[in-house]
Amino acid sequence: MKFSVIVPVYNAEKYLHRLVESVLQQTYTEYELILVDDGSTDDSYALMKQYAKHYDQIKAYTKENTGPGMTRKCGFEKSTGDLLFFVDSDDWITNSTVLEEIHNIFIKCSTVDVLFFDREDVIGNTKEVIRGFEEIEEGFHNINEIREVIRPGLGAKILKRNILTSDMFVESKIFEDLFTTYLY
């Protein structure tokens, strides 16, 4: 199974190196890193092109500024992986075996379409673990109950490609991934 790590980039020159290096350090190597510049005014795209020039698994694209929703859509359309991992440009992956571990889960549990996991928010010197979901009792539930326990947004989730379509991405500058989350 191939991963597509999709990153919308906007004026992220100072963060991009940390993110790209954290992906390059993954022990599971069947992935592509799709970097899509959303009309940055800094040198983000130049840095992206340098990485793409040196690493075959990195692809760099640029487009006019339309916000993260359309930028993620562009990345989705350019991607070829079976598993999609949307990452913000100021994020990074702290564990070099994450893709390998996730790959193994999808191999063992082939009927899983979405994998939720915890993330750590870091603001200054403060770290907070954000759970990917809250546990609920097994059984039948109203869809609104399920929506309350699933964390919205595309971060901290791996999705099978076949559950998304291009029209699930909306043009908005903020909270655009909430819409996408509730469609799948």
Language-model-detected regions and their locations in the chain:
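Cell-envelope/extracellular polymer assembly enzymes that use nucleotide-activated donors
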Residues: 1-4, 22, 32, 179
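Short, well-formed alpha-helical segments that are part of the catalytic scaffolds
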Residues: 11-25
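Conserved short acidic donor-positioning loop in nucleotide-sugar-dependent glycosyltransferases
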Residues: 23, 38-40, 66, 89
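A conserved acidic beta->alpha catalytic loop
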Residues: 29, 37-46
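Glycine-rich, basic loop-to-helix element that forms the pyrophosphate-binding segment
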Residues: 63-79
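Short aromatic/hydrophobic "clamp" motif used to bind/position activated sugar donors
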Residues: 84
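Conserved donor NDP-sugar-binding/catalytic core segment of glycosyltransferases
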Residues: 97-129
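Conserved nucleotide-sugar donor-binding catalytic segment
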Residues: 142-184
